A protein has these predicted regions:
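Short acidic active-site motifs
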Residues: 187-189
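Ferredoxin-type iron-sulfur electron-transfer modules and their immediate structural context
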Residues: 1-113
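Beta1-alpha1 glycine-rich phosphate/pyrophosphate-binding loop at the start
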Residues: 28-40, 48-51, 78, 82-86, ...
Length: 189
């Protein structure tokens, strides 16, 4: 997917006031806003909008069932076909990885320490948002590899390990501490 393809896909969006695509998104991504910014070729700002609700845009853009969620709710689907929101989302996420755009970070560090059990999509997202809010976060993962079902259950042709690992690296760079091969009740109590 190149920039010209994305601009063409984004141009189909009418940036509806009622935002049915956002309502259809379980994460409540501000879809019309990140697509509006993509149309203006302001991809870094579009990434900032996405990062308010997801730290896994490269991943979700590839594997979410968009046709049942945001795209399935798209107001344009009955006229010109739904806007390909997933493709736009993962393009923006990939641009963030390629250009080294960082996730938002808190300027204020808190004293509290929080443990997150499991480095799957929920655990990593929770850890990232806690860290973004200044908490000291340690993630305990049973296995050697991070990502949970994303790593162990999604085939490589749907989600390549390089994209997944680069996305996880962005989360770790927030200051999240990771401890692998730690099983609750076995290695740690």
């Amino acid at each position: 997917m190149n920039k010209e393809d994305i601009l063409k896909k984004a141009s189909k969006c009418s940036t509806c006031i009622t935002k049915p695509c956002q309502v259809g998104c379980p994460l409540n991504n501000d879809t019309t806003e990140f697509i509006r910014l993509a149309k203006l070729e302001e991809f870094e700002k579009a990434y900032e909008v996405l990062s308010k609700t997801t730290v896994l845009s490269s991943v979700c853009g590839r594997i979410c069932p968009h046709e049942k969620q945001c795209q399935g709710s798209c107001a344009m689907k009955n006229y010109y076909g739904a806007v390909e929101i997933g493709n736009i989302e993962y393009f923006i996420g990939d641009e963030a990885i390629k250009n080294g755009w960082k996730l938002p970070q808190s300027k204020e560090k808190r004293k509290e320490k929080i443990a997150v059990v499991g480095a799957g999509p929920s655990g990593l997202t929770c850890a990232a948002f806690l860290c973004e809010n200044g908490y000291n976060v340690t993630v305990y993962e049973k296995y050697e590899h991070l990502g949970g079902l994303l790593y162990h259950g999604i085939p490589e042709f749907r989600l390549d390990k390089k994209t997944l690992n680069k996305t996880i690296e962005k989360i770790i760079n927030l200051g999240v501490e990771i401890k692998t091969n730690c099983e609750l009740g076995v290695n740690i109590q």
